[in-house]
Amino acid sequence: MSWLKNIIRPKIATKTKRDMPSNIWEKCPGCGDMLYGKDLEISARVCNGCGHHLKFSVEQRLEHLLDEGTWSEVEQPHLKADHLKFKDRKSYSDRLRVARRDRGRRDGIVVGNGKIEGYPLTLCLMDFDFMAGSTSSATGKGTLNAAAISYEKKQPLLLVAPLSGARMQEGILSH
C-alpha cells in the first residue's frame, strides 16, 4: 500500500465496475485524438481533427453500404487450407485456426446479395481483420463464386478489397 494511502484514506469506494461498451471511444491512428463512437459513425469513420480514414470492419461496411435487412450471405465451399504444410514460427494451420476462431469465419472473404437504394447486387467483401487481409486460394475461389452469382442473377458485382497481398504460406496458390 502506498504511504499516501496510509495518511489520507480514500473516502469513496466502488464495489463494482460499470460495464461500458468498448466502442464508445476510439483513438485516431493519424493524430492520436480520442474520437467519440457516435461522432465516428456520423462522419463515416473519418477523424474530424486530421481527416484520417479509420478502418471499417466487414460488419460496419455492410451496415453502411446496404439497405437495412437486405443482406443474405452465400456460404462458400470449404477448401483444403494448408497445401504446402508451411511452417515458420507457427504452422499455417495453427495461424488459420486462431484467425477462424477470432473472426468467426473460415477465411477472409464474405460473399452475398443485398440491395443499395432498392437495387439488387452481389457483394464480395474482403476482411482485413482476417490474417491482415491477405489473399488465399479460398479468397480467389470466393471471388470467382461472387462473379458467377452476379452473372447468373444478371446483377452488378461490388468487390470491396482492403487487402495486403498474397499469403506467403500458400505460395502461388494464393492467387
Spans of features found by a protein language model:
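Terminal-region recognition feature
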Residues: 1-175
